[in-house]
Regions:
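Retroviral integrase
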Residues: 2-147
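Charged alpha-helix within mobile-element recombinases
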Residues: 138-175
């Protein structure tokens, strides 16, 4: 009655099976610390080009005391800004950051930065690329800051190109 081709059925079944696959995420718990600035979570947020030329926001958060730091940068070459941010946090708050936790961002895990971390006895923990679930505190904090900055811009009826100022104001009110 029906003319069925086995190749077509097999292909449809493969498509159905592929659609039902779930993303497997490592659920290894992150080590908890009680000391502020023991671990600093870092992420790069891609934005639209700002009025001052920046296109990326380098964001760092301490999950223990929920302290945020941000630098607006014009390229993904953020190592000098990252070093300056870490040194400013350590000098201002008289502490030593022991672990820097980043996602697999290529601009944050280069050899020069790894050597800098090793020389200052700081562990650089890099998660798998394109897996934001493994960098949870930084991703959540980045989403919060982006949301608050967007509300500030829309509430004041300002152009979107002023996002660096809105993000810095959001961090100021959060801290």
């Amino acid at each position: 009655m029906y003319d069925i081709n086995e190749d077509e059925i097999t292909e449809e079944w493969e498509v159905c099976a592929m659609n039902d696959n779930h993303k497997q995420i490592s659920r290894v718990p992150m080590p908890k610390t009680n000391r502020a600035f023991h671990t600093l979570f870092v992420d790069i947020i891609v934005m639209t080009q700002a009025i001052t030329g920046e296109q990326y926001a380098l964001h760092a958060v301490c999950p223990v005391i929920k302290f945020h730091a941000l630098a607006a940068v014009d390229s993904k070459a953020v190592i000098p800004d990252m070093k300056a941010m870490i040194q400013q946090i350590e000098q201002t708050l008289k502490t030593h950051i022991e672990v820097i936790h980043t996602d697999g961002e290529s601009s944050l895990n280069g050899l020069a930065f790894r050597n800098w971390c090793r020389d200052r006895h700081t562990l650089l923990h890099i998660t798998v690329p394109d897996t934001p679930e493994q960098n949870g505190p930084s991703e959540r904090a980045g989403g919060l800051i982006t949301k608050r900055a967007r509300h500030k811009i829309q509430g004041a009826n300002l152009p979107v190109v002023l996002w660096p100022f809105a993000m810095k104001a959001s961090i100021f009110t959060i801290n």
